[in-house]
Amino acid sequence: MDAKKFLTGGVAGGVTMFFLGFLIYSVLLDSFMRANGAAAAMKVEPDFPYLVLSQMAWGAVVTLILGHWAGVSTLAGGLRAGAILGALLGLAIDFELFATMNTMNLQATLVDIVAQVVRFSITGGVVGYVIGMGGRR
């Protein structure tokens, strides 16, 4: 994968992660997560520069794994690989946090894993599509 595909895939993935995160966590799951998590640990407003940086980094991670290592270059391939990546990352990160911190109860932890599968699957689809665009004429 060349630098242009990595950059465009990474940016597209980061933007997708950012907006899906807003939709899932701030719109759909806000009251549920506040009721089942440590509300005192949440900031009233997130530090957006760091949030954007985080989502761009996730976009780069998805692009590197799917585009460079797995050779994904289609929407369908990205959706599949992204779902697997989201499930593995969600399980690993959420259960580690559940085991070591008091930030969410088990119900919220399980819901968050499902949310990560959705986020990474759609992001993987976008990244796969964007990477594959260069091959079409």
List each language-model region with its residue ranges.
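Juxtamembrane/disordered regions of integral membrane proteins
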Residues: 1-137
